[in-house]
């Protein structure tokens, strides 16, 4: 179970973060000079101070765009800093974007095999520069926080607190329902029109494992093979790995099922929780949760 709990952390670029100035008016700090806004660097230092766990040297939680010493006029907290999110943030005067997932199409925000002259990538970088925006990623430490910030927000969004197991917060024991009913409930609560399911529609289920985001084949299959897991909910996964494994388990008449929610809806509420948390100690600038739009539409709904 411990292996199932852990997140994979990969090396990233060097940290570009300093210490918070003595004049910063964040919770627990002296009031700053009148009318002075905190810089992005100071906001991040306050996050490091309040997150409740040691800050790791090797992390993707770094600045991805902009000058960290930019005074912050507003903070947009989001699941993914898509072009749409950046445009909405800029229109609202939010020049610091705190994103959970990458901004530039790769875990380290260095898209392999893509030339810097690529039109889409270039326009996104230019937009950030032209609007004086700063992007900082908050992934590893938000997951490592106790409890995991993403998991806490998602469990609250689904209303599953009373079903959560104390010894492993990623496992849930709930009243019996069919797999089809469970999938429909998850889709409705998370606002995801693209939920996909592997398994028998009418199978009665009570024991659920939840793996938000993209945990990978090893952790996903280890979860599915557990005796106390009938259904695994994931954000996204490769179809020729975990999906095929789940399909084979069903063909072998094992009581197993897989629900694929979509990466964004599987973690979105966790970043809404992050915005609520930030407001507890960042008092100098407005903070808003800016939801990332679901990028997919289906033929069945006509794209509505």
What residue ranges belong to the model's regions?
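Hydrophobic structural segments
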Residues: 2-6, 13-304
